[in-house]
Design a protein with these regions (language model features):
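Function-determining surface determinants
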Residues: 3-295, 306-424
Length: 424
């Protein structure tokens, strides 16, 4: 009897310990059976928590980028006054230039960073020229000189890049006349070698960027003390805007008459055109939709078909036409900016060709060795002159459209457009 009971107990224990026996039959939960589900739960909770943290971090980064882009928007924001907007634009462009030029110890600047910094400096010079009356002549002269010198420090690499790109563009336009000439190939190779040398030297020279950076930080500190009057509309900058436009108009007339050096006249005109472009971009409203001016209606004559009482009636003619006129008027500043941008591109291409022509005439690489024979030089200069004549004709035609008004009428039109944009 005792043996039978012991045998039965052993059998039950064996069933409880059997790995393939019925689940938990005759046994209690072990340590592993408790820890494993708990560990899985904790791991899942940690993964969810980490996912939430990463999602929040990504959202915060996107929000920060959006806020930074908004602060650095080179235009008036919705509901923003002129003084507030120009102060934001000035500080935003200064911060952008400083950020592009600031590097860690031992690091070199990138070409794209230098390019963005130079663009910001050009915009800043246009801004303080627009604020000349507000800042005063002494402050304007000081800051303009500082910004001009900072831009000059960064210009060597860009100038070397432009002359290579100009020759390559000419080669693409006239492959049949230039591709087979060894002198053109040698000139191209010499200019590319010079570009690489200048770019590497400029980017590796930390003192150049450091000096420009110190100057810009000084401007940034002084800019915090600028006091701009919050007068309605564009009243605060209207005198400067008329002067800026008038200078460009006079330069256009000199270039059209062809008196003196045509190359110098066109280059001086180009500077005034770029100032006008940046001024118009700053005064433009970022929230305006380019399509608004064309949305008079989807039916002829700006009428809206409305079915009422079983008949087709047309309503809203005057209201819709008035809205369309106001939208077109509000977009006038943007049209000026775009025309000035296109004109500046034409004048810039003409000037780049003039620089290339000077290099071709010198018939030597930077080391003084001749790179092109007489026939190659004649062919290049002939094609350059032909291209320059075409660009000049286009530029003068566009300039006539852009500068057809007098300074007073132009400023009045900008004032009206700014008011229309503010009304929405």
């Amino acid at each position: 009897m005792m043996t039978t009971k012991r045998t039965a107990i052993r059998r039950r224990l064996a069933v409880g310990r059997a790995p393939n026996g019925p689940p938990w039959r005759g046994r209690k939960r072990g340590h592993e059976a408790i820890v494993a589900p708990l560990a899985a739960t904790l791991a899942a909770t940690a993964a969810v928590g980490l996912g939430v943290v990463l999602a929040r971090a990504g959202r915060d980064r996107r929000a920060a980028r959006a806020q930074l882009a908004r602060v650095r928007q080179f235009a008036m924001l919705p509901g923003e006054g002129l003084a507030t907007g120009l102060e934001r634009i000035g500080l935003g462009q200064l911060d952008l230039a400083i950020e592009m030029l600031a590097t860690e110890d031992g690091q070199t600047l990138s070409e794209s960073a230098v390019h963005e910094a130079r663009k910001a400096l050009k915009r800043l010079r246009a801004l303080i020229r627009l604020l000349e009356d507000e800042l005063g002549g002494q402050v304007f002269a000081r800051e303009n000189a500082v910004l001009r010198e900072a831009g000059r420090r960064l210009s060597a690499a860009r100038d070397a890049e432009v002359i290579v790109a100009t020759l390559e563009d000419l080669m693409r336009r006239h492959p049949g006349e230039l591709a087979h000439r060894r002198g053109v190939v040698r000139l191209h190779a010499a200019l590319r070698a010079e570009r690489e040398r200048v770019v590497q030297q400029s980017l590796a020279d930390g003192s150049t960027a450091a000096d420009a950076l110190d100057e810009l930080r000084g401007v940034r500190r002084r800019a915090m003390a600028w006091s701009l009057s919050d007068r309605p509309g564009i009243e605060a900058v209207e005198p400067a805007l008329k002067r800026l436009y008038g200078r460009g108009r006079r330069r256009y007339r000199r270039a059209a008459l062809g008196s003196g050096s045509r190359t110098l006249a066109l280059h001086a005109w180009r500077k005034r055109v770029k100032e006008l472009r940046y001024a118009a971009e700053m005064l433009d409203r970022a929230d305006l939709d380019d399509r608004d001016g064309a949305r008079a209606s989807r039916t002829p004559h700006g009428l809206t078909p409305v079915r009422a009482g079983g008949k087709l009636v047309r309503r809203g003619r005057k209201r819709r036409r008035k809205q369309a006129r106001r939208r077109r008027e509000a977009l006038y500043i943007r049209r000026v900016a775009r025309r000035a941008d296109e004109l500046g591109e034409l004048l810039g291409a003409e000037h780049d060709l003039a620089v290339l022509a000077g290099r071709v005439r010198s018939q030597a690489d930077p080391a003084g060795a001749p790179v092109a024979g007489r026939g190659t030089r004649r062919a290049l200069l002939r094609l350059i002159a032909k291209r320059r004549r075409r660009l000049r004709r286009q530029a003068l035609r566009e300039g006539k459209r852009l500068y057809r008004r007098g300074p007073k009428r132009f400023a009045a039109r900008v004032r009206s457009a700014s008011a229309a944009a503010s009304r929405g």
